[in-house]
Amino acid sequence: DDAVADGVHAISGVVDS
């Protein structure tokens, strides 16, 4: 996940990559 979206998509970020 992106560093910026990491805060918002902490969970989705893992799948979103």
From Swiss-Prot:
Q: Family per UniProt?
A: Belongs to the Frog skin active peptide (FSAP) family. Septenin subfamily.
Top-rank taxon, per record: Eukaryota
Species of origin reads Osteopilus septentrionalis
Signal peptide: which range, if any?
none
Which compartments does it reside in? Secreted
Tissues in which the UniProt entry reports expression: Expressed in skin glands.
Q: What is this protein called?
A: Septenin 1h
Keywords from UniProt, A to Z, are: Secreted
Gene Ontology cellular component terms for the protein in this record:
extracellular region
Q: What does this protein do?
A: May act as an antimicrobial peptide.
